[in-house]
Amino acid sequence: MKYKPTYHHSDVEVTKDEVVYDGFFKMHKRELRHRKFNGEWSEYMTREMMVRSDAICVLLFDPVLDKLLMIEQFRPCLPEHESPWLLEVVAGMVEEGEADEDVARREAFEEAGVEIKRLEYMFRFVPSPGGLVEHLRMYAGEIDSSAVDLEATLGLDEEHEDIKLHLFDTSDVMSLLEQEIVNASAIMALQWFALHGAKLKQKWLATNN
C-alpha cells in the first residue's frame, strides 16, 4: 500500500516570513495558515523555525572485511542525563552548488580519513519538522578499512572537531542498536543496514570481481 500526502504546498498560505536571527543557523518567524482535514482553513498562526541547508549522512561500509566505520565526537546540545559524546555516521552540510557525492567524499576524508569508492542511496528524512527546516539524505559509502588507524583523532581544527574512529563487525549491528545510541541518523542507518546490508554486500562484491 502506498502513502500519498493529503495536501501539498498549495494548501499552505504564508503571509509573513521574517528572519529574526542570521548566524551559523538562521531563525525565521512565519505567519501562516493551512488547510485542515475537513477542507476548511485553519486560523492564522505564528511559528518560529530554525532553517539549515540540506545535509548528507554516510554509513561507511567495507564489504570485503565486513566492517562498519563510525565516528564519535562531542555534541553540545544534549540534555544533562545524556553523554555529549555520540556515536555517529559521517555527515556534512551541502554547500551551494555542491553535489551529494562531493559532500560525502569530503566529509569521509575529513572526519574518518578514508576515501569512498562508490555510494549507494539509502533514504531521505526530515529530523524535526515541527521546528527545523532541514532535509537529510542518507547513503552507504564503500571503503577499504584495512588501513584505518583507530588511534588517530581526526576532524578540522577550524571547526573545533575532535573525532575518534570506531570499527565494528557487521555482525554487531543488532547489538549496537540495542545499546544506548541516541543519534537518530546513526540509528536509522544501522536499521537500514540490518535490513539491506547483506544484499548491498553481495552487489558490491559482485561488481568488484
Predicted regions and their residues:
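Nudix hydrolase/Nudix homology domain
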Residues: 1-7, 11-12, 72, 78, ...
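Acidic pyrophosphate-coordinating catalytic loop
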Residues: 18-23, 39, 79-80, 125-137
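Conserved hydrophobic/aromatic beta-strand scaffold that supports enzyme active sites
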Residues: 27-29, 70, 138-140, 165-167
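Conserved Nudix-box catalytic region and its N-terminal flanking loop in Nudix hydrolases
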Residues: 47-50, 67-106, 148, 157-159, ...
